[in-house]
C-alpha cells in the first residue's frame, strides 16, 4: 500500500453554524486574530509539509478583507487555497426537523442580543422585548439567518463540494499522492508546534485522528488552563483515499453518517 499523501489544514473561515456574516468590522478583527494566533501556530510548525485550505461563503470572494488576506499569505509564502462554497462538511446546526429549526431560531436571537448587549443578562423577558419592541435582529442579518435556517443548508452540500473539490483537483498534481489528510481547525485556535509532524507519523489508513485534550487561553489575562472535553472536540484529521476525497458522492459516503465532530471515532 502506498504511503504517499497530501496534507490539508482546513479552516472554515466564514459560513459555520447559524450565524450570518457579521460585517466587515467583525471579519477584519477575525483576520487579525487568525494572523496572531492560528497562522503563527502554523508557521511555527516543526513540519511545514501541509497546504492551507480556507473556505468562505460566495459573497466573500471579492471582499477587500479576503483579498488582503490572500496577499498576506502570499507574502508569508504560505501555500493556500481559498474556496467560496461555504462549509465543506455536514453542519449539525441545520438539522431538518422542525424542533431543531426552532431551537436554532432561539439561538440566533440569543446570540444577536448578546452581541449587542454584552453586559446584559439574556432571559425570556429580554427575548420577548427584543422580538416585539426593539426588533434589533433586523440590524444583524435576521432575514439572511432565517433564509439559511429554513432552506436546508446541508441539501446543497454535494453541489458545493463539487465546485470546491474540483478547484483543488485542478490545481494539484494528483498523481503525486494516493491519500489526503484533512486536519480541521477554527480561525481562532492554535495547534501545538509538533501537531503536523505527529499526524504525519501515522501511516495512511481509512479513518480519523482526534485531539482529545488541549488548552484554553485567555488572551486578556494570559491565563492558560487544561481542556479535557467529554466528547471529541472539532480538531480532527480525516484520512481519505484520494479517489474518495475528490469525488463528492464518495466524499460524503466516506463520513458514514457522521453529523458532528462528536461523531468522529
Q: Which positions does each model-derived feature cover?
A:
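Hydrophobic targeting segments
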Residues: 6-11, 22, 42, 50-55
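Short, acidic, metal-binding catalytic loop of nucleotide-sugar glycosyltransferases
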Residues: 37-49, 72
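Short beta-strand/loop segment that forms part of the nucleotide-sugar
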Residues: 48-60, 82-87, 185
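Active-site-proximal specificity loops/subdomain of glycosyltransferases
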Residues: 64-180
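Short beta-strand-to-loop acidic/aromatic patch adjacent to the donor-nucleotide binding site
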Residues: 177-190
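Hydrophobic/aromatic residue at the end of a short beta strand that borders the catalytic acidic motif
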Residues: 191-195
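Conserved donor-nucleotide/metal-binding helix-loop-beta segment in metal-dependent transferases, i.e.
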Residues: 196-213
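Short beta-strand-to-loop element that shapes/binds the nucleotide-sugar donor at the catalytic cleft/hinge
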Residues: 209-223
Amino acid at each position: 500500500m502506498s504511503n504517499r499523501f497530501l496534507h490539508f489544514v482546513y479552516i472554515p473561515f466564514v459560513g459555520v453554524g447559524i450565524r450570518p456574516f457579521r460585517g466587515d468590522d467583525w471579519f477584519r478583527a477575525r483576520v487579525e486574530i487568525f494572523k496572531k494566533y492560528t497562522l503563527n501556530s502554523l508557521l511555527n510548525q516543526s513540519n511545514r509539509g501541509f497546504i492551507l485550505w480556507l473556505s468562505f461563503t460566495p459573497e466573500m470572494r471579492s471582499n477587500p478583507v479576503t483579498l488582503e488576506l490572500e496577499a498576506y499569505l502570499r507574502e508569508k509564502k504560505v501555500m493556500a487555497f481559498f474556496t467560496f462554497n461555504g462549509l465543506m462538511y455536514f453542519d449539525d446546526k441545520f438539522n431538518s426537523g422542525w424542533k431543531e429549526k426552532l431551537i436554532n431560531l432561539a439561538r440566533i436571537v440569543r446570540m444577536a442580543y448578546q452581541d449587542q448587549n454584552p453586559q446584559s443578562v439574556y432571559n425570556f423577558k429580554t427575548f420577548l422585548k427584543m422580538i416585539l419592541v426593539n426588533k434589533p435582529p433586523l440590524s444583524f442579518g435576521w432575514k439572511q439567518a432565517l433564509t439559511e435556517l429554513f432552506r436546508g443548508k446541508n441539501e446543497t452540500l454535494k453541489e458545493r463540494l463539487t465546485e470546491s473539490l474540483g478547484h483543488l483537483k485542478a490545481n494539484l498534481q494528483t498523481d503525486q499522492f494516493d491519500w489526503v489528510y484533512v486536519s480541521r481547525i477554527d480561525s481562532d485556535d492554535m495547534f501545538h508546534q509538533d501537531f503536523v509532524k505527529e499526524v504525519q507519523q501515522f501511516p495512511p489508513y481509512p479513518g480519523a485522528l482526534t485531539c482529545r485534550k488541549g488548552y484554553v487561553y485567555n488572551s486578556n489575562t494570559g491565563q492558560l488552563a487544561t481542556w479535557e472535553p467529554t466528547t471529541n472536540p472539532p480538531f480532527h484529521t480525516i484520512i481519505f483515499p484520494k479517489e474518495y476525497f475528490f469525488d463528492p458522492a464518495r466524499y460524503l459516503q466516506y463520513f458514514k453518517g457522521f453529523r458532528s465532530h462528536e461523531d468522529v471515532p
